[in-house]
Curated annotation (Swiss-Prot):
It comes from Nautilus macromphalus (Bellybutton nautilus). This is Uncharacterized protein IMPP19. Nacreous layer of shell.
Length: 16
C-alpha cells in the first residue's frame, strides 16, 4: 500500500 502515514512509515505494509 502506501496511502496513509503508516503506509509511508512501514513501506506501505500497513495501509489504513
Amino acid at each position: 500500500g502506501g496511502g496513509s502515514n503508516f503506509g509511508q512509515f512501514a513501506g506501505g505494509l500497513l495501509d489504513r
